Amino acid sequence: MSRSGDRTSTFDPSHSDNLLHGLNLLWRKQLFCDVTLTAQGQQFHCHKAVLASCSQYFRSLFSSGGGHPHALALGPGAQDGLGGAPPKEPPPPPQEEPGTPSSSPEDKLLASPRAINNLVLQGCSSIGLRLVLEYLYTANVTLSLDTVEEVLSVSKILHIPQVTKLCVQFLNDQISVQNYKQVCKIAALHGLEETKKLANKYLVEDVLLLNFEEMRALLDSLPPPVESELALFQMSVLWLEHDRETRMQYAPDLMKRLRFALIPAPELVERVQSVDFMRTDPVCQKLLLDAMNYHLMPFRQHCRQSLASRIRSNKKMLLLVGGLPPGPDRLPSNLVQYYDDEKKTWKILTIMPYNSAHHCVVEVENFLFVLGGEDQWNPNGKHSTNFVSRYDPRFNSWIQLPPMQERRASFYACRLDKNLYVIGGRNETGYLSSVECYNLETNEWRYVSSLPQPLAAHAGAVHNGKIYISGGVHNGEYVPWLYCYDPVMDVWARKQDMNTKRAIHTLAVMNDRLYAIGGNHLKGFSHLDVMLVECYDPKGDQWNILQTPILEGRSGPGCAVLDDSIYLVGGYSWSMGAYKSSTICYSPEKGTWTELEGDVAEPLAGPACSTVILPACVPYNK
C-alpha cells in the first residue's frame, strides 16, 4: 500500500491470477474469441489480445493489419500473407501463356477483410500449438521428450521466448544416460548450445570406454552420433588422448573414417590443423591437405565429390523450390522446403538469394542447381531471368554461377553426363527454340542444336542418354509433340505425338517408361485440366493412356521421382479455380494415386522439385 496525500494505492496480488483464470475460462468455453488459428487441419479459437500480449509475431501482425494472412508461411524469409485484393477487372489468362491464371476465386477469399481472423499456421504442428496455447492461458506447459521438440519449434516460430526458455530448462533437467542421444539431436536441430554441451558429456563418457573396433564402428555408423563432422573429429581426438600411449597408433585409421571436406575451411585451420598429429602424421597430413584443396575450388566441388565430401546419410528427401502464390501482387516465393517423412509435414529448409517461379532445378552430386525463371509474374516474359545458383545442403550455402546466355522461364533443364542443358522457354522476345549447354567442369555455357520449333511450357525427361521434350505451347497453340535429342550427334528427332495436347505438365521417368501427367489445354477460350495420364515406351515409340487418371487437375506443379513413386507438389487446378498446396503421389507399380499428409507453406504454381540428401540434423527453423 502506498499513500499520496489523501489518495491510497492498494496492490492486489491475486488479480493477475484471477485475470488469467478468467481468460482461461473464456477460452475453454469459447467465449468472445476473435481469431481462429489452424495447424495441420486442427482449429483453435483464441483471443487476439492474449496472443499479442505474449507473442511478438502476433503483436506485429495484428498491429500492422497483417495484409490478408489467410495462410501464413512461417519460417526464414516467409511472407506474412498471400496477397491483397485483385484488380477490379482482372484480365483473362493470355493464350500465349497458359501456365498461371491472372486471378482466381481464391484471390477474392484472400482479399476478404475477415481473413485476418482466420490464420493457417503452416510449419506449426497441432500438438505443439495446443500446448503453447495452454501455456498462454494457464502459465503451465506440459512437456515430454515426445512433445518438447514440437513445442520448441512453435515457440520459436511465433517468437514466445518464455516457452522456449521452459523447453530448454526441461531438456537440461531431463538429460540422462538413457536419453542423451535424443536430447542431443533436439538441441542440435534448434541451436541449443548449453543443452548440447550437457548431453555431449554423457556421450563422451560412453565413447571413452570403447575399444578400437567399437570406436571405428561408431565413426562408420549412420546416422552419426553427433551433429557435425567437426564434433565427430573432436570426439575422436578425446578418445585418442584418453590413453595416448596405447591409442595414438590408431589415429591414421580413425582419421580415414572422417569426412574432412564436410568441415568448413576456417574450422579446418583453427580446430583441426591445431591438433599435433594432424600436422606430424603423413596420412593425417594428406587427409587435411586434400580437404583444404577441395575448399579452394568451390565452383568445381560438384565435379570432385568423394566419400570424404558426402553427407553422412543415404536417405533422399523431397525438396520444393520457389513458386508463384495466388494474389494480384504475384511476387514469387524464395522458400526452399523439404518434406519430413517422419513428421508428415513440409518444413522450411532455407531461402534462395532471390524470388523465382517457372524456373528449373537440377540435382548434381547432391548439389542443387537453380536456373532461370522469373522474379515477377508477367504474361509476356518481361521478368524472365538468366540466373544460375547452386545450393550446398552440407553448409546451407549458395553461390552464383555464370548466367545462361539467354533469359528464360517456363523451360526445361536437365543433367546429362558432365553437362547441364536448358531447352526452350520464353522471355521478352517471345518463345524460344534455343538450347544451351553448361559444362560442369569448365564452368562455361555454349549453344547446341536448337529445337525444331520454339516452345514454352513444355515438359522434359532424360532416358537412356537422351533428352525427351513433350507438349508445350508453340506460337499460342497447344501441341502434343514429342522430340528426342541425341547429345552425341547433336540432333533432334520427332517421335510419336501424345494422345492429348497439353502444356504446363510434367514428364517423369520410371522403369524405362515416360509418364506425361497433369497440365491443361484450350477448348475455345477456356482452359481445361488434362486428367488423362499417358505412358510412353521409348523402344516401341508408342503412347498409351493409363486407366487411372490424375486425382485432380494440376497445371505447373513441381515434379520429382522418389523411390518407386512420382510426386506432384502444388500447381493450379482450372476446374477448382484454386492454387494447390497439397502433394499427390502416383505409384506406377500399383497404378494408384494417394495424397500426402501436410501442405507446403502456401499454395503455389510454377515451383520446381528435386530430391537431395540432407544432413541428419537439419536446423530448419533457425
From Swiss-Prot:
Entry annotated with the keyword Transport: no
Biased amino acid composition, Pro residues: 87-96
Disulfide bonds: none
PROSITE patterns listed in its UniProt record: BTB
GO cellular component: cytosol; endoplasmic reticulum; endoplasmic reticulum membrane; neuron projection; neuronal cell body
Predominant localisation class: cytoplasm
Domain BTB: 33-145
Domain of life: Eukaryota
Kelch repeat placement: 317-366, 367-418, 419-465, 467-512, 514-564, 566-614
Keywords: Cytoplasm, Endoplasmic reticulum, Kelch repeat, Membrane, Repeat
Disordered as annotated region, ranges: 73-108
PANTHER family referenced in this protein's UniProt entry, alphabetically: KELCH-LIKE PROTEIN 14 (PTHR45632:SF6), LD33804P (PTHR45632)
Name used for this protein in its record: Kelch-like protein 14
Name of the coding gene: KLHL14
